Amino acid sequence: MHDSVLERVTLRRSLGAKYLTTPAPSKEDYAEALTWAIAAPDHCHLSPARFVVIEEREKFADFFEAGALADGADQEGAQRARSKALKAPAMVAVVAKIDEHNERVPTYEQWMTVGAATSNFLAALELKGFAGKIVSGSSTHYRDAVDALCKKCEVIACWIMLGTAKPDAPGAEVLSLI
């Protein structure tokens, strides 16, 4: 492995939306990242992770707002939830299908595969010059978002907020040394 690749991946840090700017990854960038994601360890080749690029951001902002209101948020809280779907230049959903009845592959192994695939996905995008952060919490359970993305027996494991790191992002001084 090239030392520069290893160094770049080990210097990767999560960067929230306020530290991200355009450009966002292209379809080609996502395709390459997916090849890394599917290379994750996967006992019995269950492929428990799917990555969905969210192109209809306003629609998902509506889902986040409605979900927050359904969870009891006031109008200000609902607007904060809404803004989370729009802040980063790009948003990807990690959808997991965990087979709880699989006798050969326990659920914890399947979740480890989802995590490894997500890590590989992020590492590939990092090597292409992008940055991002995994976000979970209540937004992964908002009914409209789940209904829009998930098939039977699937859940939203997390969201990945992506873009290009701003020059003043934490760790930018380290990345500039590469």
Q: Where are the regions a protein language model picked out?
A:
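C-terminal helix-cap and adjacent tail motif
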Residues: 1-17, 152-178
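Short secondary-structure junction motifs
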Residues: 46-49, 127, 131, 157
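Short loop segments at secondary-structure junctions
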Residues: 56-58, 97-98, 164-167
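Small-aliphatic-rich amphipathic alpha-helix that forms the alpha element of a beta-alpha
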Residues: 37, 92, 98-146
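Short proline/glycine-enriched turn/loop segments at secondary-structure junctions
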Residues: 146-152
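N-terminal amphipathic, basic helical "cap/leader" segment at the start of enzyme domains
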Residues: 1-88
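Short coil/turn connectors at secondary-structure junctions
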Residues: 87-90, 130, 153-156
